[in-house]
Amino acid sequence: MAKTITISEEAYKLLLKEKRDGESFSDVIVRLIKGNRREVMDYAGIWSDMNDEESNKLFKDLEKMWERWNVNA
């Protein structure tokens, strides 16, 4: 069942740029939404080439950011 929606001119132009030959706007929207969904397991092993020093620095930096975030919350 088709539904009618209203989008801004800017949204229309952006969708038009993403649209491929033979693709409907519905197809574009579905492709873009599904393409942006990632599962946690998609990231498994992504940092496997990181050494211990780099890993420790990353987590220390993250802790600092989390502390700042908690203070501002």
Curated annotation (Swiss-Prot):
Q: Which Pfam families match?
A: VAPB_antitox
Keywords of this protein's UniProt record, alphabetized?
A: Toxin-antitoxin system
What are the TM regions of this chain, as residue ranges?
none
Indicate the family of this protein. Answer: Belongs to the UPF0330 family.
Q: What does this protein do?
A: Possibly the antitoxin component of a type II toxin-antitoxin (TA) system.
Tell me the protein's name.
Answer: Putative antitoxin M1627_0365
List the source organism: Saccharolobus islandicus (strain M.16.27) (Sulfolobus islandicus)
